[in-house]
């Protein structure tokens, strides 16, 4: 999620958010000591940002590719193994590639629309200029929902992930599995709720930081955590697969066989196909982050050349992101084809031994999630300001809103911790509108053509199919929650 345009940068995955702000030199949150308000519309920079010159940096294809790739990468990359069991490994990879193509198509539509707004660099302003204030309000409402959902999802993930780190690092002999540890200690109210209260208090302090550039280090933690964990999964998947073949696989029992190409399970009563597609929509959600990245090209190149370079960067980023997703899908699936965990970093170690490298990964990911959370809160607050307070928030309101928001999200996360369901809700009810519908509508409206032309109707029909798939995934998830 990009904080540079006062919106958000999706995830799940905000490790480089503050870096985008620093590189593109866009406006920041300014505390006005005279009227004790935060004015998000001020253009000048204060001492906390220490500006030296107002020269926009010249974007490169390599830099833009890296930034777009990093926007898409996050902990969702480790959630695909469980879907491979129902989809079939091959078909899940096919679906991933299809979503990647959709991702490239809709991003380029947003870029073309943005190229026609010379004085606008952020999602909200572009939306208002092309489609009016009402659509900007609609967009900001979706951004608010997105930020809330991501904060709750990450808080819900931190608790069991950190618990697995504690269990595997210090209690492995006494409690061989996390379930044993959770039943005996970690899941007890006297541990769980103080943990959430303390964690949320620290989060509130981070969210009240005036200069978000001070959180730049979270970018390196986030990128390092994902790369390290992916590397561990890649290196170890062979030994885990050999263990599975030796101890679990039974030639006569097909239920123990890996599911390579059978997609029937995804279409059974729980309709896991739609939930899996909604998860993929979330994994590729990066569209609001493209506008500040494209701004670097727009400032320094002609319109045609800037669009061409951004399209090329998007293509490279999509290919790289998809390659990393496929590697994660294959390696995570091979780690445990029979009973995969919701996240591969939840996996049980072989022979109940101590997997030191995965223990480190769990600690690393937990830290990255915590320091990434402000990247979802800042755009939430700014979207609230855009919609309800004309871009200004008093200091007292800021403090109260921060604590209330964080603790409400933590309270929900403490009782509802189904990570894959969070991703289905985000992808099914929010991402399809923010990442698919609105960019395509911006493009079609910027063309000054009738929407009834056959090629425009074809694009709208394609988006409609994606929305139906996403919403169905969200509805199926609700039904599962009600049943369970």
Where is each model-derived feature located?
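Alpha-helical transmembrane segments and their membrane-interface exit regions
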Residues: 98-106, 226, 431-438
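Membrane-interface "cap" regions at the ends of multi-pass membrane proteins
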Residues: 2-79, 103-108
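Central hydrophobic cores of alpha-helical transmembrane segments in multi-pass inner-membrane proteins
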Residues: 75, 100-109, 199-208
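Membrane-interfacial loop- and helix-cap regions that link adjacent transmembrane helices
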Residues: 56-57, 62, 108, 114, ...
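Extracellular loop-to-transmembrane helix junctions
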Residues: 81-113, 120
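Membrane-water interface regions at transmembrane-helix termini and the short interhelical loops
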Residues: 81-87, 200-222, 411-422
